[in-house]
């Protein structure tokens, strides 16, 4: 699935087109079509309760309507073992499946203090 980047991933502002590749039911790969950059992402709902309001700026930018089919992912920094990998819950990637656009939405940490920028996956695994 090829997406047009409407609001760039921080530090990767030059990337305008990305491909979303499903790896399994939890993980996806987001690969740039402009260079060799790629990100491993996770479905946050597989780990925790995760809710936030999409600011109106992003809704307009991505033409998000109430009926829009959205997918939310979070970038992870992969480590071994996998449980030591960290998840960025502060800046989710929002994908609008209706028009194939995506944006990185940076959440206001004062509004969402429960979400961290580098939370270990092991903190969400039942032991």
Curated annotation (Swiss-Prot):
Main location: cytoplasm
One GO CC term on file: cytoplasm
Subcellular location: Cytoplasm
Coiled-coil boundaries: none
SUPFAM superfamilies recorded: BH3618-like
GO biological process: bacterial-type flagellum assembly; regulation of translation
Signal peptide start-end: none
InterPro entries listed in its UniProt record: Flagellar_assembly_factor_FliW, Flagellar_assmbl_FliW_dom_sf
HAMAP family registered for this protein in UniProt: FliW
Family: Belongs to the FliW family.
Function in brief: Acts as an anti-CsrA protein, binds CsrA and prevents it from repressing translation of its target genes, one of which is flagellin. Binds to flagellin and participates in the assembly of the flagellum.
PANTHER family registered for this protein in UniProt: FLAGELLAR ASSEMBLY FACTOR FLIW
Quaternary state and interactors: Interacts with translational regulator CsrA and flagellin(s).
Protein name in UniProt: Flagellar assembly factor FliW
Organism: Campylobacter concisus (strain 13826)
Encoding gene (name): fliW
């Amino acid at each position: 699935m090829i997406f047009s980047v409407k609001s760039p991933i921080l530090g990767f502002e030059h990337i305008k087109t990305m491909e979303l590749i499903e790896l399994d039911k939890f993980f996806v790969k987001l690969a740039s079509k402009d260079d060799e950059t790629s990100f491993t992402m996770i479905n946050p709902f597989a780990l925790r309760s995760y809710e936030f309001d999409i600011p109106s700026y992003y809704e307009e930018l991505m033409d998000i309507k109430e009926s829009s089919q959205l997918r939310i992912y979070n970038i992870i920094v992969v480590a071994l073992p996998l449980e030591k990998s960290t998840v960025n819950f502060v800046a989710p990637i929002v994908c609008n499946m209706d028009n194939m656009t995506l944006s990185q939405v940076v959440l206001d940490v004062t509004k969402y203090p429960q979400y961290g920028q580098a939370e270990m996956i092991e903190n969400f695994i039942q032991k």
